[in-house]
Design a protein with these regions (language model features):
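NTP/phosphate- and nucleic-acid-binding module
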Residues: 2-607
Length: 607
């Protein structure tokens, strides 16, 4: 199923499948819990030893990386707490051996490594994206490219190097990135006369050329986008996909004649970002505007989509669309003549209005954190590189080669039916037991597993197991004659159900708070807080300090300034405002603030 097919299905209704009355085979999903072991001749002792050694090395590598501070964004546990961290039930050889609820940081590392999403690199804070995760990014690219090209946006590529003079040209802008800029100072053994920066973002790279290319109002709007990587170096707690020193993203940069044209595009792009999360990744987001304190440095205003990580109770910024106003066009001299001036009048120069907007591979990390469980990844069907896997079952030492060959021929035919209707399907022909394969595919988050053996062949059906619902509740049977219809429908049902569950969880953890005494307790219960707020920077700072200080007093834990915030910060001013604020009457929720509330503002601990 391509990204275009996925988009075609976004608004398609999902319906429950017709009831199937055939009884389901009783096959264990856990070989370590008394299930099927390796049949004779299927898996040698040497193969088992190699598999165990490989998993041990991966675990040691993850532990070594963790000791260096990688992925340690969660607050440190007390020694007494560490002893109570829960191990998950089930086989540890190929599966996750820590609980997502009890040890989220350890779980996140394991699920990414064992789920084949990435590997660690020898430069701290940099990671290798493996095909399993990169496919998700490719799907997002294809979907988003299709949307922005319809808007008239064209893709391009600018150099990754920035001269120091250009980078410093816009002081307010670069102050937001100054500590994170990586510099090239040498070429071989020779020191450069002028050091060169590696782009943290591309405003200062691109805008000198916008001034060169835009000569008339007829050249507007100019809409360019880059798919590239950027480097932001200075931080102590890198987390895969969330905070990395190099990351992949797209950055759009556009120029417009009027503020109205720029504003329309800002909201249009933000809506596309929201749909990436909601329609592709099955993740709910809240649309809103950043406060002046949290907006993009040098911009006029910033709009955002904000997600929520239930396991930690933290908010997370999903993507931002900025109106830069005329700040950069004045700095870089990007002007056109006023087309509304009368012919006999001298046409004054107008500074163009500009936008920038970006979405990164952080999307993948958010997806993993929201949907994954103690068995491993849970990948929404629309972005899964393998949507359905077919596992041969029911064969053993007594099964003849002819019977096995005939069964595999039937399975290949089933796969061909699914491929013909656009399902990304794989047949697992590896020399492992079915129980081992079940665990492995669950670990990798494949949305749907189909089992097919002699019993299914005789009954003309397949046994289907959903990844998002484990056990008998997630099992059903599908007649072979209905395979090409019911499997795509079931995949869409899985997609819809993932979103519904995540959306219900998000909504349940946004608390409307008007009494300050309820604020920190709500945060401690893993909630985000919607409060009446005055929207001043000083008040935001005070709320963060007060909520952080209260946590430190209660736990005795000092706050790491670069770790996910203990204190609550403003996430956004939601576009959808609840009722209840009366202008000039409703006070700001901060008890030390004497100002009236302007808007409901979403606060929370965040990444």
């Amino acid at each position: 199923m391509s990204a275009q097919q996925a988009q075609d299905q976004v608004d398609a209704p999902t319906s429950s499948l017709p009831a199937i009355t055939q009884s389901l085979p009783d096959r264990t999903m856990d070989p370590a819990a008394g299930g099927e072991g390796p049949p004779a001749g299927e898996m040698s002792k040497n193969a088992a030893k190699k598999a165990a050694k490989k998993e041990k090395q991966a675990a040691e590598k993850a532990e070594k990386s963790a000791n260096k501070g990688i992925g340690k964004a969660e607050s440190k546990s007390k020694p007494s707490q560490k002893a109570h961290k829960k191990k998950t039930d089930g086989p540890a050889l190929i599966g996750i051996d820590v609980s997502k609820e009890q040890d989220f940081s350890g779980w996140y590392q394991q699920v990414l490594l064992k789920g084949q999403m990435l590997d660690y690199y020898d430069v701290s804070g940099c990671f290798i994206l493996k095909p399993h995760s990169y496919f998700i990014w490719e799907t997002i690219q294809e979907w988003f490219n299709n949307k922005i090209k319809k808007m008239g946006v064209k893709n391009c590529s600018f150099p990754l190097f920035v001269s120091e003079d250009v980078l410093k040209k816009e002081k307010d802008h670069i102050e937001g990135f100054a500590a994170e800029v990586a510099w090239v100072t040498h070429a071989g053994n020779s020191a450069l006369e002028r050091k060169i920066a590696i782009r943290p973002t591309s405003e200062t790279v691109m805008y000198p050329y916008y001034a060169k290319w835009i000569r008339s109002h007829r050249d507007l709007p100019l809409r360019l986008n880059q798919w590239n990587s950027v480097v932001r170096w200075e931080f102590k707690n890198p987390q895969p996909f969330l905070r990395t020193r190099e990351f992949l993203w797209q950055e759009g940069h556009t120029a417009h004649l009027t503020e109205a044209g720029a504003r329309e595009e800002v909201l249009q792009i933000l809506e596309h970002y929201a749909h990436v999360y909601e329609d592709l990744l099955a993740i709910p987001v809240i649309r809103g505007q950043k406060t002046d304190k949290e907006k993009f440095a040098g911009g006029l205003y910033t709009t955002t989509v904000e997600g929520y990580i239930p396991a930690t109770g933290r908010g997370i910024q999903g993507g931002t669309s900025h109106c830069l106003g005329q700040n950069f066009s004045k700095m870089f001299g990007i002007t056109v003549e006023d087309p509304s001036a009368k012919p006999e009048e001298k046409k004054p120069a107008l500074h163009v209005w500009q936008n920038s907007w970006g979405l990164s591979t952080r999307t993948i990390g958010i997806m993993v954190m929201v949907h994954g469980d103690d068995r491993g990844l849970v990948i929404p069907p629309r972005v899964a590189d393998i949507q359905t896997v077919i596992v041969p079952v029911g064969t053993g030492a007594r099964t003849t080669e002819a019977e096995k060959t005939a069964l595999m021929a039937e399975i290949d035919a089933l796969a061909a039916v699914l491929q013909a209707v656009g399902v990304r399907v794989e047949v697992d022909k590896r020399d492992y037991t079915p129980g081992w394969k079940f665990n492995d595919w669950e670990l990798h988050g494949v949305p749907l597993r189909l089992e097919f053996g002699p019993g299914e062949s005789a009954g003309h059906y397949v046994t289907a197991s959903r990844r998002d619902i484990l056990g008998k509740d997630g099992k059903s049977t599908i007649p072979i004659t209905e395979l090409g219809v019911q499997v795509p429908a079931l995949l869409e049902t899985i997609q819809a159900d993932l979103y519904k569950r995540a959306d219900a969880t998000y909504k349940a953890h946004v608390k409307h708070i008007t009494n300050w005494d309820d604020f920190t307790p709500a945060l401690n219960e893993k909630n985000l807080c919607m409060i009446p707020h005055c929207l001043t920077e000083q008040c935001e700072d005070e709320i963060k300090d007060m909520s952080a200080r209260k946590v430190e007093e209660e736990t005795g834990e000092a706050q790491d300034a670069r770790a996910p915030s203990m204190g609550a910060k403003s996430l956004c001013i939601p576009f959808e405002q609840p009722e209840g604020i009366e202008k000039g009457v409703t006070k700001c929720t901060n008890p030390n603030c004497e100002l009236f509330a302007e808007k409901w503002c979403l606060f929370g601990r965040s990444y």
